[in-house]
Regions:
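Conserved recognition-core residues within compact binding domains
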Residues: 1-80, 85-115
């Protein structure tokens, strides 16, 4: 059985490559838990809806993976998750890094110039 590892949400486990599992909680129709179907937002970001205290929260898979598996050297400064290959569908922890908004924009411009 997988341990809960998503901060602030009981019953959820995120893998290093961005797959989300929820274990069975009372009143749930799933006997043993389930792997969640991920969806794409209008901006081509992979999202999922997690529930806490009966309320749903739409969260980015990249943020969840980064919160659990990617070290943030300065949480008060680095609040944005950057995709190192600029592919928002690649949510493997090795492709994610914490940074500032300006760092993220600079990286995107640099990558576009290289192509």
């Amino acid at each position: 059985m997988m341990e809960d590892n998503v901060p602030g949400f009981i019953g959820y486990h995120i893998t290093r490559d961005g797959k989300l599992y929820s274990r069975r909680i009372e009143r749930s129709p799933y006997k043993f838990g389930k792997w969640h179907k991920l969806r794409l937002s209008k901006k081509a970001r992979v999202k999922v809806k997690l529930y806490k205290d009966g309320r749903g929260y739409n969260l980015s898979i990249s943020r969840l993976v980064a919160l659990v598996y990617v070290y943030n050297p300065n949480p008060s400064k680095f609040k944005e998750v950057m995709h190192l290959d600029n592919n928002p569908l690649n949510n493997n922890y090795k492709n994610l890094q914490w940074g500032t908004h300006s760092m993220n924009i600079q990286q995107m411009i640099f990558e576009q110039r290289r192509r």
